[in-house]
Structures are given as C-alpha cells and as structure tokens.
Design a protein with these regions (language model features):
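Walker B catalytic acidic pair
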Residues: 61
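Active-site-proximal or metal-binding-adjacent scaffold patches in catalytic folds
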Residues: 1-56, 65-95
C-alpha cells in the first residue's frame, strides 16, 4: 500500500530527486525526511489509518526533498499537492 500511494503521489512533483523509502514503526513521528541522504521514512502505523493521512504524510515528506524547512514555499508546495492538508494535519493531532 505504501509504495502504490507513493508512486501515485510522486508524479505530482516536478524535479523530485531519486530517494530511498523506508517503512518502520516510530513512536513520535508519522514521517521523516533526510534531504541530504535522500531518504524518506514513513511510520508503519499509517497502514491502519485512512489513506488521506498516509497521503498527507507522503506529500509532506516529499515536499521536504525540495524544501528542507517549513518555509512558506514548503507549505505552498504541500497545499498544491494536498489541498485539505490543514484539516488533515489538525485531525492527526488527535491521534
């Protein structure tokens, strides 16, 4: 499921560098991106959540491959690829 969602979403991005995907259980994060190492890690627990949450985390982390910080440009890119990200982000704080 992770790979199919990732493949569907990454085509929305231009100039996305090649990167490695890692899935593992994390206790405090839904995802993490190491831009320098070109590695995206997703929390394996996302498999139990609605796909909108998985999609948001993927978009968020892929956006970090382009913008390392949470700048205005970063959030614009997230919104471009996940229109309702603000609501999804709010809902995820309840988990």
């Amino acid at each position: 499921m992770f790979n199919s969602r990732l493949e569907r979403l990454k085509i929305q991005f231009e100039n996305l560098p090649n990167f490695r995907l890692r899935i593992r259980k994390m206790s405090t994060r839904w995802g993490v991106c190491n831009k320098k190492l070109k590695k995206v890690t997703l929390n394996s627990e996302l498999i139990y959540k609605d796909t909108k949450y998985l999609d948001y985390v993927i978009v968020h982390e892929l956006s970090h491959l382009i913008h390392a910080n949470h700048s205005k440009s970063f959030w614009s890119l997230v919104e471009e690829n996940c229109r309702d990200y603000k609501q999804i982000k709010k809902e995820m704080k309840e988990f």
